[in-house]
Swiss-Prot record:
Pfam families: Ribosomal_L36
Name used for this protein in its record: Large ribosomal subunit protein bL36
Family: Belongs to the bacterial ribosomal protein bL36 family.
Gene Ontology cellular component terms for the protein in this record: cytoplasm; ribonucleoprotein complex; ribosome
GO terms, biological process: translation
UniProt cross-references to InterPro entries, sorted A to Z: Ribosomal_bL36, Ribosomal_bL36_sp
Origin organism lineage: Bacteria, Pseudomonadati, Pseudomonadota, Gammaproteobacteria, Pseudomonadales
Species this protein is from: Azotobacter vinelandii (strain DJ / ATCC BAA-1303)
Keywords: Ribonucleoprotein, Ribosomal protein
Length: 38
């Protein structure tokens, strides 16, 4: 899980979602692409 000021999709399978007011990126194919805005 990377914590970044600006989260971006890193591949075509990344999805940007908003959970409890926090923007996150989840990725099914590459778990290293997981990010959280912070």
């Amino acid at each position: 899980m990377k914590v970044r000021a600006s989260v971006k999709k890193l591949c075509r399978n990344c999805k940007i979602i908003r959970r409890d007011g926090v923007v996150r990126v989840i990725c099914s194919t590459e778990p290293r692409h997981k990010q959280r805005q912070g």
